[in-house]
């Protein structure tokens, strides 16, 4: 299990954060697939592998390792995020060899369409920065498809710095966070 401390369980009125458990796996996978379908219907290929049954981030294994966090309202799954304290093979391919010791890797941030438009995505991202503490980690890194202007704009508004593009078409962002 990963060493972390949840500093703030509440992220908004009635929404709370907690580590995912094995029993959450099916609903999390369903949320991610529905999000991939929603993205596809809007012309994006982000997360398209999920629609083919491919899960490069191994949701179930990541839950077992303590890397997946759910956000619920009245026990209903509202959002999910994966926070890796060490880079995956995917992250190493995108980011190269530098800066891994002090980085958290954020993946699979998804909000249920039922809760869309309430600023929940921004609150989950803020929670990843300040609502949970990973010892000795001073930055969050994330990637997204290069053709999503809305997502790029969102990350920049949230204070993430564009770090460049990977040869395979992914944009890289990172943000410094306070380590205690």
UniProtKB/Swiss-Prot annotation:
Q: Which Pfam families match?
A: Acetyltransf_1
Read off the InterPro entries from this record.
Acyl_CoA_acyltransferase, Bact_Acetyltransf, GNAT_dom
Q: Which SUPFAM superfamilies has this protein been placed in?
A: Acyl-CoA N-acyltransferases (Nat)
Residue ranges constituting the N-acetyltransferase domain according to the UniProt record = 31-180
For this UniProt record, the keywords arranged alphabetically read as follows: Acyltransferase, Transferase
A single Gene Ontology MF term assigned here is: acyltransferase activity, transferring groups other than amino-acyl groups
- Family membership noted in the UniProt record: Belongs to the acetyltransferase family.
Tell me the protein's name. Uncharacterized N-acetyltransferase YesJ
């Amino acid at each position: 299990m990963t060493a972390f401390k949840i500093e703030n369980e509440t992220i908004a009125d009635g929404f709370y954060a907690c580590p995912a458990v094995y029993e959450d796996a099916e609903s999390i996978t369903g949320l991610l697939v529905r999000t991939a379908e929603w993205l596809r219907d809007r012309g994006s290929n982000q997360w398209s592998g999920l629609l083919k049954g491919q899960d490069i981030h191994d949701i179930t294994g990541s839950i077992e390792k303590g890397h997946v966090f759910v956000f619920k309202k009245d026990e209903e799954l509202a959002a999910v995020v994966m926070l890796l304290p060490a880079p995956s093979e995917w992250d190493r391919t995108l980011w190269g060899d530098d800066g891994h010791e002090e980085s958290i890797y954020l993946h699979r941030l998804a909000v249920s369409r039922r809760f869309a438009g309430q600023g929940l995505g921004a609150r989950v991202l803020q929670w990843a920065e300040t609502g949970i503490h990973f010892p000795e980690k001073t930055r969050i890194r994330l990637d997204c498809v290069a053709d999503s202007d809305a997502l790029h704009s969102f990350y920049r508004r949230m204070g993430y710095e564009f770090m460049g593009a990977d040869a395979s078409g992914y944009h890289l962002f990172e943000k410094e966070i306070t380590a205690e």
